[in-house]
């Protein structure tokens, strides 16, 4: 009986994927593509763009930060959606 209960618990955890975390791109500007697993509970990715003396800058990561005026922000909620 204990073995059956333990088996059911393990199968439930695998099926529900209780430890699921969102994966987002996190490379900056024109660097090679890299991804990171977001903290548990963080379900969105962002792509932030602006211009400065270096030219066009792109920042990517987990979450959906607040930005200052003049900065383009795109937030999304699917795997690797912020490229």
Swiss-Prot record:
InterPro entries: Snake_3FTx, Snake_toxin-like_sf, Snake_toxin_con_site, Toxin_cobra-type. SUPFAM superfamilies: Snake toxin-like. Expressed by the venom gland. Keywords: Acetylcholine receptor inhibiting toxin, Disulfide bond, Ion channel impairing toxin, Neurotoxin, Postsynaptic neurotoxin, Secreted, Signal, Toxin. GO terms for cellular component: extracellular region. It is found in: Secreted. Residues 1-21 form the signal peptide. Disulfide bonds join 24-45, 38-62, 64-75, 76-81. It comes from the Eukaryota. It holds the Pfam family Toxin_cobra-type. GO terms for molecular function: acetylcholine receptor inhibitor activity; ion channel regulator activity; toxin activity. Binds to muscle nicotinic acetylcholine receptor (nAChR) and inhibit acetylcholine from binding to the receptor, thereby impairing neuromuscular transmission. Belongs to the three-finger toxin family. Short-chain subfamily. Type I alpha-neurotoxin sub-subfamily. This is Short neurotoxin NCA-02/NCA-05/UER-05. It comes from Laticauda colubrina (Yellow-lipped sea krait).
């Amino acid at each position: 009986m204990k073995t059956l209960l333990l088996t059911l618990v393990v199968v439930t955890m695998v099926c529900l994927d209780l430890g699921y975390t969102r994966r987002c791109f996190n490379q900056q500007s024109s660097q090679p593509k890299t991804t990171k697993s977001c903290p548990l509970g963080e379900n969105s990715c962002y792509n932030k763009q602006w211009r400065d003396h270096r030219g066009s800058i792109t920042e990517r990561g987990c979450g959906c930060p607040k930005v200052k005026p003049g900065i383009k922000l795109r937030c999304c909620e699917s795997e690797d959606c912020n490229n």
